[in-house]
A protein has these predicted regions:
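C-terminal accessory/tail domains of diverse enzymes
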Residues: 2-100, 104, 128, 132, ...
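Metal-dependent DNA replication initiation modules
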Residues: 24, 111, 115, 131-148, ...
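An acidic- and aromatic-residue-enriched active-site/binding cleft used to recognize and process polar
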Residues: 38, 78, 106, 111-116, ...
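Short, surface-exposed, charged/polar-biased interaction segments
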Residues: 50, 54-57, 89, 96, ...
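Surface-exposed, low-hydrophobicity interaction/linker segments
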Residues: 102-126, 215-218
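Short proline/glycine- and acidic-rich turn/helix-capping motifs at secondary-structure junctions
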Residues: 114-118, 181-192, 286-304
Length: 423
């Protein structure tokens, strides 16, 4: 429940189309990790010991966070503009987590839910967390989950609301691509992301509504405070929201990912979607009416109940069969919808040099399956022993990042010239 992210700044920009240099939109990554009993795959409450060691290490003291559960630790990354830098830091931190797991005789896993769970979790000793337990009561018994959160820098909250509106139609697909929680309390749920289903119990969850502008967003959030356990704005649990203390938009739909490559793929796609939305606004659109006709149709024509249903569908099927296509509002072969997303953000991926590695990782994802598919295969083949081997092989596996040189593209100057903001 802690945050780290990235900020951007930008001034007025002409509407004339010019040749511009590659954008450097900033981003930050929050990864949550479980420590698990290797014999039962239930959470193991050793995170405080790990935190105390990393919190005094100069390399990690600013990016290591306690989390809600006593079996969790969080890496809240530094601010990045380059995926290769992010890959290096994610891999290094995961190596630390894996090493500490070995010291304490437990397994470290980056998964959305533990394969098995205690009747009620051990909570980190923090007054705010204890208040959440009091307010949410029985919901907390099943709130044993880890997520991946991606912060992307925005030049203003108006741009942020425009981006929020523009990315809503893609949330079902991003949910399908990032599903990594098929197991719960010792059985296969049949879902790719059981965490997504569990989170629907909270007062605010799933796809956020559309907003007309930043003032509308802020007014409606304030109305939620004090209702249904929403004691503060950090408890707004939509799949995507604006940060309240950083100039970022925060994606929250993803389960914690098995490998750093899985994380980097989601981060690159989230950044590209935000860049696309910001560029559309700077080309003459508004938060509620992007100038680009395709983006506008994606944002306006899909009713909230359809997006909500599509997210549940994605949580169930992952990429195994079909996926929700935001261009048609219907289901289509999952691989086709993934490639539609790549087409949608092709220019943005090229401008940051991420296109080649994203395409490579997408092909790997479509070939090998999501984290949920890989967990399910290990579980079905060898039970707990199979999961133990999978987690050991993936927690600190070396990342694969093939980064091409950024390319200048024709368009208005980007609103995403970066200026990092510490958390």
């Amino acid at each position: 429940m802690s945050t780290r992210g990235a900020g951007t700044s930008g001034g007025e920009r002409p509407h004339a189309r010019v040749r511009r240099e590659p954008t450097l939109t900033t981003f930050g990554i929050e990864e949550e990790f479980f420590f698990l009993d290797p014999d039962t795959m239930q959470p193991a409450d050793v995170a405080e010991h790990v935190y105390r060691r990393l919190a005094v290490d100069p390399r990690w003291q600013d990016v290591t966070m306690r989390e809600f559960l006593a079996s969790q630790i969080e890496h809240a990354s530094r601010v990045f503009t380059d995926m290769t830098d992010a890959a290096a830091e994610l891999h290094a931190f995961r190596r630390e987590v894996a090493a500490d797991a070995g010291r304490y005789g437990v397994s470290a896993a980056s998964v959305g839910t533990p394969p098995d769970a205690h009747a009620f979790p051990s909570i980190t000793d923090n007054e705010r967390y204890h208040r959440v337990v009091r307010d949410m009561a029985g919901i907390i018994a099943d709130h044993q989950m880890s997520g991946l959160h991606i912060h992307v820098g925005i030049p203003s909250r108006e741009h942020g609301v425009a981006a929020l509106n523009a990315v809503r139609p893609w949330l079902p697909l991003l949910t399908a691509m990032s599903g990594n929680s098929p197991l719960w309390r010792g059985y296969d749920t049949g879902y790719a992301s059981w965490r997504t289903i569990q989170l629907r119990r909270w007062t605010t969850s799933g796809c956020p509504p559309r907003f007309t502008d930043a003032a509308d967003y802020d007014r409606r959030l304030r109305q939620l405070l004090g209702i249904g356990g929403t004691a503060d704005l950090a408890l707004i649990s939509w799949n995507v929201r604006l940060s309240e203390h950083l100039p970022t938009i925060e994606f929250r739909m993803a389960d914690a990912q098995l490998t750093s490559d899985d994380t980097l793929l989601i981060a690159a796609l989230c950044r590209a979607l935000v860049m696309r939305a910001v560029e559309d606004v700077d080309a003459g659109g508004t938060a509620d009416a992007p100038r680009d006709a395709v983006t506008a149709s994606l944002a306006v024509d899909l009713p909230p109940e359809l997006l909500s249903a599509a997210i549940v569908h994605s949580a169930h099927t992952g990429l195994g069969t079909d996926a929700f296509d935001p261009a048609t509002g219907t289901l289509a072969p999952a691989a086709d919808v993934v490639r539609r997303l790549l087409d949608h953000v092709e220019e943005q991926l090229a401008s940051t040099g991420d296109r080649e590695f994203v395409h490579d990782l997408v092909e790997r994802l479509l070939r090998d399956g999501t984290g949920a598919a890989r967990q399910r295969a290990a579980w079905q083949k060898n039970g707990i022993a199979g999961l133990r081997r999978l987690y050991a092989a993936t927690i600190a596996s070396p990342p694969y990042v093939r980064r091409s040189e950024p390319t200048a593209i024709d368009g208005p100057p980007s609103a995403a010239a970066s200026a990092s903001t510490p958390a």
